[in-house]
Swiss-Prot record:
GO terms for biological process: chaperone cofactor-dependent protein refolding; DNA replication; protein refolding; response to heat. Its main location: cytoplasm. This is Chaperone protein DnaJ. Participates actively in the response to hyperosmotic and heat shock by preventing the aggregation of stress-denatured proteins and by disaggregating proteins, also in an autonomous, DnaK-independent fashion. Unfolded proteins bind initially to DnaJ; upon interaction with the DnaJ-bound protein, DnaK hydrolyzes its bound ATP, resulting in the formation of a stable complex. GrpE releases ADP from DnaK; ATP binding to DnaK triggers the release of the substrate protein, thus completing the reaction cycle. Signal peptide: none annotated. Pfam families: DnaJ, DnaJ_C, DnaJ_CXXCXGXG. Gene3D superfamilies: DnaJ domain (1.10.287.110), Heat shock protein DnaJ, cysteine-rich domain (2.10.230.10), Urease metallochaperone UreE, N-terminal domain (2.60.260.20). It is found in: Cytoplasm. The keyword Transmembrane helix does not apply. Zn(2+) 1 binds at residues 151, 154, 203, 206. SMART domains: DnaJ.
Length: 377
């Protein structure tokens, strides 16, 4: 991977925008981060080159030089890859958003940095399926969760009797120096993850993990109007730290589809089957709504797929409670079979409108003539 073009490393096109670049970097940094891939040398190397590529391409000056002269041009200017420069804050923001805590309500994770000696993130996320009506009206649900708690026998270190020894990879510093061309930068040690120490002998109780898993039942109040992809923070129900404090639980909702209603944001769509005679003559019919039913007035000659909009009959907005629209769309129903009496009545109706019985010959005369002319030459 180290021989690849920087754009190929980040899996983006050469004309990608800054936002596209940042999104691609976030995805790959999360995928190859040492915390997610302990003792994986290949992931560690990929993580380094992903950071190197982003440091170059996210800097306008470096990117211009790289586009013209390649990596050699950067080294000739003393502008190799690696951490440093204006984008370090950008990178830390991304890491904090991926691995931090804090935050509140709906949205992403916060920016609390993790203690290097902590074997796991305190915040974690699970998916919570909801029935269609539970999401629309809100509900209270009891869910069982599994969270991590420090191993009492080793004090959460993962080492037998809590005995640790100096990390031989970073010499106990918790960081290692990396070099890219003339530049060098410090990176969290991938072996000890910044702690500066390593396990001498695994704890027999937790097998070196530093934690055990516990289960608990949590009552969740789901607000009305949530939709698939919305996230809810539940403070104090994440993993437990060594000091006894707990992180936060994040719930990502997945809303099941309904048999009749189709949701689009806060709007609700429903298909209304209408017999063709009802559409022609006009009629007032009852249709279901989220709260019950209402009357839909079909005017004479209502068209197939015609829509009728009812304001305030949709889903309440999860933030302000304002309801969306109910949109009823007509689906014309035609009879599959007719008897002789019905056929006779329909033919009389057709004649009363002056409709020609044989494929509208007069209507298509000019078209027939045009087609004949195609074959004359």
């Amino acid at each position: 991977m180290s021989e690849m073009d920087y754009y190929e490393v980040l899996e983006v096109s050469r004309d990608c925008s800054g936002a596209e670049l940042k999104k691609a970097y976030r995805k790959l940094a999360l995928k190859y981060h040492p915390d997610r891939n302990p003792d994986d040398q290949e992931a560690e190397e990929k993580f380094k080159i992903v950071n190197e590529a982003y440091q170059v391409l996210s800097d306008d000056e470096k990117r211009t030089i790289y586009d013209r002269y390649g990596k050699e041009g950067l080294e000739g200017q003393g502008m190799g890859g690696g951490f440093g420069g204006a984008n370090m804050d950008d990178i830390m923001d991304i890491f904090n958003s991926m691995f931090g805590g804090g935050g509140g309500g709906f949205g992403g994770f916060g920016r609390t940095r993790r203690d290097p000696s902590q074997k796991y993130a305190l915040d974690f996320e699970i998916e919570l399926p909801l029935a269609f009506n539970e999401a629309v009206f809100g509900c209270e649900k009891k869910i069982d969760i599994t969270y991590k708690t420090p191993c009492e026998e080793c004090g959460g270190t993962g080492a037998k009797d809590g005995k640790m020894e100096t990390c031989d990879y970073c010499g106990g510093q918790g960081q290692v120096l990396m070099r890219q061309g003339p530049m060098q930068f410090a990176q969290t040690c991938p072996k000890c993850h910044g702690e500066g120490r390593k396990i001498a002998q695994k704890c027999p109780s937790c097998q070196g993990k530093g934690y055990h898993e516990e289960t608990e039942t949590v009552t969740i109040k789901v607000p009305a109007g949530v939709d698939s992809g919305n996230r809810l923070r539940v403070p104090g129900h994440g993993n437990e730290a060594k000091n006894g404090q707990r992180g936060d639980l994040y719930l990502t909702f997945y809303v099941e589809e309904d048999e009749h209603f189709i949701r689009n944001g806060n709007d609700i769509y429903i298909e209304v089957p209408v017999f063709f005679t009802q559409a022609i003559l006009g009629e007032t019919i009852s249709i279901p709504t989220l709260d019950g039913e209402l009357e839909l007035e079909l005017k004479q000659s209502t068209k197939d797929k015609e829509q009728f909009i009812f304001e305030g009959e949709g889903v309440p907005d999860v933030h302000n409670g304002r309801k969306g629209r109910l949109i009823a769309q007509v689906r014309m129903i035609l009879p599959k079979k007719i008897n002789e009496e019905q056929k006779e009545l329909l033919e009389k109706l057709q004649e009363s409108y002056g409709v020609e019985s044989r494929p509208h010959k007069s209507t298509f005369e000019s078209a027939f003539d045009k087609v004949k002319n195609w074959f004359k030459n």
